[in-house]
Amino acid sequence: MRINKYCWFFSFSIKLFSVFTIIYLAFLFPIKAHHKIDNPTIKFSESPEIRNFFFEWRGHINLDRKKENHETYHQVLEFVKGWNKRYETDFELHIADLKNSSLAIPKVKFQNKYNFINNKNFLFSTFFSFNLATEKNSSDQIEYKFLFQNKFKYFVFNNGFGFYKNINGKNSKNTVLKYFPLIYFKKPIISDINLAIAGSSDFGKISKFSTYTNQKHQYGLGIKKTFQKNTPREIDLTIAYLKGLNSKSFDQSLIWYVNKSF
């Protein structure tokens, strides 16, 4: 009985810590940045109880030795509609704390994802987005990605290659390449909490890659927990920590994801 009591207390403490961490990240820091690792999975269910609408709130805070980068942040509200097993559309509002406004929406994204291959252990999808810039000196952007997923016995490996091209402004001729890997371990480490290794690499312009010291690389660990699992109130929470690998990257970033289906 005593062991069960301690196990229950530890499980409850983990849940409570996760909730307070999210509240702390969301409201205590003044926030300017954005991480997302897309995967080729289409959010769609044939269950009549699910309307195939999905909502995600995510963001991250940068901790950096440079004063202009320290405690900067960026949040995203994403709305997803799954139309069938092959196709979904996404709408994103990017919310940032800018110098001339306490709350601004510097970017709006209109996205489409289509799945081409959906085998037992391998998925491949393409992703296209038109990114509308709302700030005066910013450029609209076309973003497209090739997304892969390999399923192994003990883990799932997602990796995506993203291409970003400004379609107006002085940098409109440049296309930037980014890489987003994620390894998700199937077996929970404790109390239905799963571990993941994730990161992002910005190689610069594909016409002439930046040298390593001028690239941006961040990698680290994350944990995922599903609350109220298999109930109408089910919600996913992910918290991650990324470490910059070179001087051009942010020293550290704290990331959160909250997902809910309807």
Where on the chain are the PLM-derived regions?
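Cleavable N-terminal export/targeting peptides
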Residues: 1-38
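Transmembrane beta-barrel domains of Gram-negative outer membranes and organellar outer membranes
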Residues: 31-171, 176-262
